[in-house]
């Protein structure tokens, strides 16, 4: 199955378009876990085990593992190998010249064996091609990110009046989606941008961070991001789920929070 087919099959099976971001901050983890690579692994593995039937994907952020050096990389490898069912999106935001991109793509798809990766389009199509040619894997292109500084570049207007983020979306649709394995990252903190991107790309997967701690509104986001037939939107939540409790019952608390979010997403889909 292709990445898109895997996501949709998982979403149907789990009745969920929730994606849990695995962004483990050691100082916020349960106090009984060590603040090292092994603690991060144990924390994320427990979250995955507790919520695997409630999500359409997991998204580990590579930076939180790289921060521990070789031990962190090993922890990430082992975490991806767990594969409790939902696909794994490696949040790496890679983007570099051809030969470097080739190495990044091998690391993501052949070494770590992630199902998808986030990529940065700033260097253009030749920096994305090494990832895109892995036709069974997914590539989520940064389009309109959830951080406040996204306005600095992504909202710049081109000569024809389009914002840069919309040009990226249209380029992804027309030039980079030759294998049907391309998606877009669009932040929940920018509902107008989500609406514009969805209108331009009605059949592409959207990965939507920014709900919860970053302030994105769930109902507004679902209305803007959901496609007509199948939703094709992966609502990513991290801190709200990960740090629902700092005690020994943290995994159960994460499950309760994930269940609430999954049901809220489904209710918003029904109400649109």
Curated annotation (Swiss-Prot):
A GO term, aspect molecular function: orotidine-5'-phosphate decarboxylase activity
Pathway: Pyrimidine metabolism; UMP biosynthesis via de novo pathway; UMP from orotate: step 2/2
Matches recorded under Pfam families: OMPdecase
EC primary class: lyase
Any GO BP: 'de novo' UMP biosynthetic process
Top-level division of the source organism's lineage: Bacteria
Annotated active site: 93 (proton donor)
PANTHER family linked: OROTIDINE 5'-PHOSPHATE DECARBOXYLASE
Record protein name field: Orotidine 5'-phosphate decarboxylase
Biological source species: Roseiflexus sp. (strain RS-1)
Gene: pyrF
């Amino acid at each position: 199955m292709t990445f898109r087919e895997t996501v949709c099959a998982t979403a149907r099976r789990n009745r969920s378009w929730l994606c849990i971001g695995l962004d483990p901050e050691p100082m916020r983890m349960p106090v009984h876990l060590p603040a090292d690579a092994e603690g991060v692994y144990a924390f994320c593995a427990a979250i995955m085990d507790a919520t695997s039937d409630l999500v359409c994907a997991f998204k580990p952020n590579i930076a939180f593992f790289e921060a521990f050096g070789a031990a962190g990389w090993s922890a990430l490898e082992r975490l991806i190998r767990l594969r409790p069912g939902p696909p794994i999106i490696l949040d790496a935001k890679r983007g570099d010249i051809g030969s470097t991109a080739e190495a990044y793509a091998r690391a993501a798809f052949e070494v770590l064996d992630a199902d998808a990766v986030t990529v940065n389009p700033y260097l253009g199509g030749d920096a994305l091609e090494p990832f895109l040619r892995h036709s069974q894997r997914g590539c989520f292109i940064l389009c309109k990110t959830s951080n406040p500084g996204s306005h600095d570049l992504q909202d710049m207007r081109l000569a024809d009046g389009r914002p840069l983020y919309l040009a990226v979306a249209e380029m992804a649709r027309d030039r980079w989606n030759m294998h049907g394995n391309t998606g877009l990252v669009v932040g929940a903190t920018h509902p107008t941008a989500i609406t514009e991107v969805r209108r331009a790309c009605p059949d592409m997967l959207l990965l939507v961070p920014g709900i919860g701690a970053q302030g994105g509104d769930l109902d507004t986001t679902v209305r803007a991001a959901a496609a007509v037939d199948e939703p094709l939107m992966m609502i990513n939540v991290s801190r709200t789920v990960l740090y629902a409790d700092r005690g020994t019952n943290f995994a159960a608390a994460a499950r309760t929070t994930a269940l609430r979010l999954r049901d809220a997403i489904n209710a918003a889909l029904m109400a649109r």
